[in-house]
Amino acid sequence: MTSNFSQPALQLCYENTNGSCIKTPYSPGPRVILYMVYGFGAVLAVCGNLLVVISVLHFKQLHSPANFLIASLASADFLVGISVMPFSMVRSIESCWYFGDAFCSLHSCCDVAFCYSSVLHLCFISVDRYIAVTDPLVYPTKFTVSVSGICISISWILPLVYSSAVFYTGISAKGIESLVSALNCVGGCQIVINQDFVLISFLLFFIPTLVMIILYSKIFLVAKQQAVKIETSVSGNRGESSSESHKARVAKRERKAAKTLGVTVVAFMVSWLPYTIDALVDAFMGFITPAYVYEICCWGTYYNSAMNPLIYAFFFPWFKKAIKLILSGEILKGHSSTANLFSE
């Protein structure tokens, strides 16, 4: 690739600085394509998740414990898109870090915190959907706004504490000081943690994922049983009361929400599993993964932050209506917050 450039064969991130990292640039064509692909992901993550947050906060019909969790998840994904992805894009394509050591630590801390915050949010959302579908009568009293607030707080505090410990205490580098020193160069920003913290990171992914798989498996079984009961009830009693009809519609909506969020969980697993496996392999096999494979795995997790709004837009009619009202400027008009987003 260096044959396409007039510079010396060996390029450095900082040509006139001792201890500079070696630069491995892409040729112009792939470079432009990568900037477009990564940039599109960042824009989608920022704009899409911002629309989710605005929708939930503005429209009163969406003010529910479950939707507050979704808005908080979107906030985490929004922060990934605006504070992590643009700088990671430059690092991935230029193979150099040009933003200083202090910001490297902050960027890495935000990267880990916001991404794992998304994981915990999805786990709590699965708990919410499980209660809503399996025990709908007591759901309003079990999963209240205060309970949702506690879940949101945990989803933010734990990842922030963990990532701060990793990047600001030095404890994660204990036992691998020689490796950290060998990889340290001017213009680099590489996350290197010891095996103990790699295992902790794996558990932060594995335990919530296992909880989600178990709960959504139960949700789909119960939802299938409920669908059969409702179909039998409706066919056997054409003259059902409006109250019973309303309950059936609400139950159907809850099941659809559970299925939609189930798709979100599947997308999350597809995005995160390669990176998690790669991190484990590297930690115990001596960083054998090629750089380009590692970058693909990393950007898989980043792109997960951009996928959720697309899933909502595809499956949630209320989100489509909210987007139309926001983009058309209708939300600036009086009483727009009381718009009916669930009308048939």
UniProtKB/Swiss-Prot annotation:
GO terms for molecular function: trace-amine receptor activity. Glycans are attached at residues 4, 18. It is found in: Cell membrane. Residues 1-31, 89-111, 168-195, 282 are extracellular. Disruption phenotype: Mice lacking Taar2, Taar3, Taar4, Taar5, Taar6, Taar7a, Taar7b, Taar7d, Taar7e, Taar7f, Taar8a, Taar8b, Taar8c and Taar9 show no visible phenotype or behavioral deficits. They however show an absence of aversion to low concentrations of amines such as 2-phenylethylamine, isopentylamine, N-methylpiperidine and cadaverine. The chain crosses the membrane at residues 32-52, 68-88, 112-132, 147-167, 196-216, 261-281, 283-303. It is a multi-pass membrane protein. Belongs to the G-protein coupled receptor 1 family. This is Trace amine-associated receptor 8a. It comes from Mus musculus. The gene is Taar8a.
